[in-house]
């Protein structure tokens, strides 16, 4: 039930270099032989899409990237568009309706991560997984982050920290959050 070692050694995907494969193996294993729908944002050369296709033999897999790709991958549908453009995301959702796994390995810009999460999360199936890679970009200025202002409201890291507060609002002494679309 492991992601085949030959698949990720022969594919120079950064997921192997970053140690993501071992983590994904743990969390994705329950989906392995199911008929799932997987969306990956940010596909570069398609290496990770090939990994998902081989690991999830019964899955419908799609990938999106802002740059049009000059390759195709058997069993994978490719979309070209901006991950922060809700109209573009709507075309993907209209075709697939919902997803079991969504992986955001796109631009790593906080505003893009927040926009795509806000649009796509409501289309994640119950018990589905939404993964955002490389959240450390919240601390890197060129991605809209800050190494100094750790509470900068516009970073993806702080968006998710606040979301954790929002989902648990009823446990505060004096609740100051109201229910939200992520409940």
Task: Identify what each model region corresponds to.
Residues 1-103, 107-132, 136-183:
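A short alpha-helical cap/connector motif
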């Amino acid at each position: 039930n492991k992601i085949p070692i030959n698949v990720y050694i022969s594919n120079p995907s950064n997921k192997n270099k970053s140690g993501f494969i071992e983590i994904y193996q743990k969390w994705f294993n329950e989906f392995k032989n199911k008929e799932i729908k997987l969306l990956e944002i940010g596909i570069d050369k398609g290496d990770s899409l090939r990994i998902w296709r081989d690991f999830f033999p019964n899955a419908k897999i799609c990938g999106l990237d802002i740059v049009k790709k000059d390759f195709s991958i058997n069993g994978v549908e490719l979309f070209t568009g901006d991950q922060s453009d809700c109209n573009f995301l709507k075309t993907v959702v209209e075709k697939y309706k919902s997803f079991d796994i969504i992986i955001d390995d796109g631009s790593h810009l906080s505003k893009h991560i927040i926009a795509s999460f806000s649009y796509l999360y409501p289309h994640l199936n119950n018990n589905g997984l939404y993964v955002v890679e490389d959240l450390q970009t919240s601390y890197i200025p060129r991605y809209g982050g800050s190494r100094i202002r750790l509470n900068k409201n516009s970073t993806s890291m702080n968006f998710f920290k606040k979301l954790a507060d929002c989902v648990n609002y009823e446990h505060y002494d004096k609740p100051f959050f109201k229910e939200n679309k992520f409940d």
